Amino acid sequence: MIAPLVIALALLAFAALANADKTTAETDTTAPATTASADSELRQRLTQREDQRRTSDPWHTDIFGRTLTVSGEVALDHERMSPRLSEPIDDGRSRLSTLSLEAEAFYSVTDRWSLFVQGRLGADKALREGDERLGWTRYVERGEMWLHGRSVGGSGLDFELGRLNFEDERRWWLDEELDALRVSGGSDKFEFSLAAARELGRSRSDQDGIDPEQQDVIRWIANAGWEWRPNHSVNLFMLRHRDRSTTESVGQVVRAAVHDDSDARLTWVGASLEGEANLRPKESLHHWLDVARVCGDEAMVEFGTHSPDEVTNVLRRKIRGWAADAGLRWQLPLPGQPRLSLAYAITSSGTTSDTDRAYRQTGLHSNLHEFGAAKEFARYGSTLALELSNLRVTTLGVGLTILKASSVDLVYHRYRQAEPATEMRAARFASELTGLATDIGSGLDLVLTFLESERVELNATVSTFRAGEAFGALAGRRYRYGAVSIRVGF
């Protein structure tokens, strides 16, 4: 009942505000001009995403004197893990192919109010352990869908309601679409936003409902950014995560489809600094620093081994952790614009009977960083693709610009745990560690990105990981991961 009510209220509010804007425009000589060019500029500002491929001149038509624009992309992604593990890529898959069609429509209803609707048709095909062949899983996925109001009532504040995109520069905090209301404002040098988010329905048609880990979770997201000098900025972040779902009790039987292992009330705060200094023509030094702290409390629900649907224990503990990620990138004044990167990430660690001091990320992150390349890729390596928790990660990278707008990068990662533990948090594959050593291992990624055409994007990744002493008997074993992605925009 909540979703229809919210939609109805939003439509009523939109009708009222649109009518108010129409009246204001009739008497306000400063109202923005209604032109196709203005609509196009607004569309690009509100909908442009780094992880999507779009043409600069999409299909458009005139409706009631305003421009309706339709665009999208077709994408094919394939990834493979070797050797096959008990739990490799995404829930036991050792190979995964995804074919998708994404389409979107943008329409400026008035000079101040705009609508955007995005949807995806997708199909996944996977091979699992033992060469068990699975058929295609087809689904419809809702993407961004929102109503945007610019400087509503002349307040200088923008309002957005619907399924919104949240992301930061390095995806260290956020890279997710959420059902939310967001208010934002600012100037050329300063900007801020405040949002409230809660999932109102399932995001894909092949899901039974809202993800149990997202059910009844309310988030408050705040951000403020200041460009204090040219090419130098500082951003402040805050995220309050409140899980209001009912925590299961010992002995309770819960269907596997609705298992929720964690109910948490957490708050993240932190800052991001970034800048670039031009040393001489075609030579520059880029730097970044991300710092964060998380605190709150969590209830961990444990299920039985022999009765996997029965709750056997509920562990309650405090969460106190911190993390930092810093790096430098030096671009040399040589043919091919070679660049050298050095980065280091560190987190807190330690667990007592009532307090977990290991940092964990927001759960909305993706840890993608461009390292000066044509497109961003996995900050902490593609084979492990782990979450920054109880870790020390040293990174060395070298990259080149090839052709006109493409790139090739070779990146090395060295992984160590802050304290010995028997698991890695949210890694691509599950493998029990000994808990006796901190050396997780090392990884090497080769990443190629081709962007020579406005419409076509090709990405290829070859990654390898060598297990360290923390893997015990598996130390020295190599794991390999490969991925190819093709996107064609329209």
List where the protein language model places each region.
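Extracytoplasmic loops and strand-loop junctions of Gram-negative outer membrane beta-barrel proteins
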Residues: R53-T55, R84-I89, E129-G130, L164-N165, ...
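Outer-membrane beta-barrel "beta-signal"
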Residues: R478-F490
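C-terminal structural cap/anchor segments
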Residues: I346-D439
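Bacterial N-terminal signal peptides
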Residues: L5-F14
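Signature for the C-terminal beta-barrel architecture of outer-membrane proteins
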Residues: G153-D158, E167-D168, W172-D354, T401, ...
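Outer-envelope exported proteins of Gram-negative bacteria
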Residues: S71-E73, F116-Q118, F237, W288-D290, ...
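N-terminal periplasmic/intermembrane-space "pro-region" immediately following the signal or transit peptide
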Residues: A15-R93, E104, S108, L340, ...
